[in-house]
Amino acid sequence: ANCVAKNNEIYYENVVYDTAGLIKQLGLDLHEVAKQIANEGVRGPFAPDFKKTKPKRKISKLKPISYEIPNNIKNLREFVHAVYDTIWNRRNFSALNNAYANNVEFEGSTGRKFKGIDNLRNFIISMVACFPDLALSIEDLYWMGNAQDGYLVSIRWGAVGTHKGNGIYGAPTNRECYLWGITQWEIKNNKIIKEWTGFNELAILIQLLADKKSSFNFDKINNRG
């Protein structure tokens, strides 16, 4: 969750639930549950206005602006944008070595947990392989800390892409899909040493697995997940 508080009261909050992880813990087939929700119109994990939060940058063949990932972080905001635009949007996966520690620890949605920059690279490539035209934008960015002691960073992001590749979400459906999530970093000595990323994995599957004849209306769903 991302929360903004004033005078000891939270007045702005964004939450991502790991509903997919919960379904797997219950011993249910995640893909079958997602397909059932999509085809039966069961109230699911979308906010009623979720499409209004779609990424600001549309799918395009044009490459995003190039930012160099600095060796020494002097401007945290520029560092965050450089990491996302260089690695996710420009597909420069070798740049992970400039941003992450070799033994980075990762925890993510649906029980993902691993250690090491190579495993992180494999995860990112697996996502981009499913959505080759994926376009990601940063919606909110918060941090605390300094260059000497390190930083704690929270990033709310959104992405849009077309499911054109084989991979963890099955055979290509050629459907446009919205992704959103919250990522938190711990940074020490100018490198990301820990990452926590929660994203809407059940919602991704719901968007992809609905039968073509389904009358499922995503705009009317009134729960988050």
Task: Give short role names for the model-derived ranges.
Residues 1-225:
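C-terminal and inter-domain tail/linker signature
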